[in-house]
Amino acid sequence: NTLWDTIEALRPDCTFVYNSVDVDFVTGRAANACLWVKSYDSDSHAWDYDLLEKTPLSDELMVELAGNRRPVLFIEGDDRHSIDMRLYSLAFPDMKVRPLGSCNKVIETVRTFNDLNSMHHLQSMGIVDRDRRTDAEVEYLRQKKILVPDVAEVENIFLLPEVIRTMATRRGKNADKILSKVRANVLRQFRAHIDEQALQHTRHKIKRDVECRIDARFNCITAMETHLRQLVNKLQPRSHYNRLRNEFLRLAEADDYLGILRVFNHKPMLSNCNLHGMLGYKSPSDYIYGVLDMLKTDSNDATHVRNAILHILHADRQDAQEKNGQTQSNNTKTVP
């Protein structure tokens, strides 16, 4: 870029046309029009091209995805070597997986990307952690093509029964016995953190409710102060806390393992349940990479675990709904 900046400065009378697939180079040419060459028909000597439109998305992202022919999956995180990136790249081998950072960035990018006329040839979806989202929040996101797993965080995927059974069998262990021990360990940890988890879930809900309710116009500071004083009674944090705590107690009493994985945000859980030790791995990281290595294989085990991941993300149902919608659209006839 420095070389070409110098050359352009020396010859302001010239128009420079660059042909490049280098994203950094293309985005480094400031204040220039970017022509996206989609294809070339040598028989008719015809080019199919478009000017990349200005969008809320970054130029780097637009250029990177312009020549991509696969559906795009946007995920959280900045590190291309993160667990999320490695796992979802293997779970969705036919998609281009792109980390974006925050969950809000994923949600906004999916919405914007799907609205772009120039990118109508590409389908895009997103994945965000469930964290402490309510069922209503999750359903809203799924309707917007944002996949939300039925586990609280990505590490919990490695505690799914299908994953544990598959890895135990591959390691020559008793799958039923190991799964039973893991379930007991997870349940014990959950019981010890029920109050804390109920409080954290309550905090998330109240924070979201405050953001919605405080976003109002006030004629004066007194009106705003009055509104804020009334918020506690309107939001009823203790009522939400008691409801959530009772719900979590019911999950524990029912030994609802999948229900606990859905709501339990606790980073040390995978390490504390000692699944890696039971399977002969030195650390939780070794176990995780063992699962990832298995997913790279062309085996029935990889297919089984991949399907379990897609199911927990509701990706299988999303695909079925889209196919059903396309079928209904194709069957619709216009009556003159």
Regions found by a protein language model. Give the residues of each.
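Extended, basic/helix-rich recognition subdomains
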Residues: 213-336
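Conserved helicase/translocase motor-coupling segment
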Residues: 70-153
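Short, surface-exposed amphipathic charged segments that create phosphate/polyanion-binding patches used
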Residues: 49-56, 110-118, 159-169
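Switch/communication elements of ASCE P-loop NTPase nucleotide-binding domains
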Residues: 1-57, 287-331, 335-336
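Switch/connector loops and helix/strand junctions flanking conserved nucleotide-binding motifs
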Residues: 24-28, 43-46, 82, 134-137, ...
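Conserved catalytic network of the ASCE P-loop NTPase/AAA+ motor domain
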Residues: 7-12, 64-66, 116-119, 138
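Activity-critical C-terminal alpha-helical subdomain
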Residues: 129, 133, 140-245
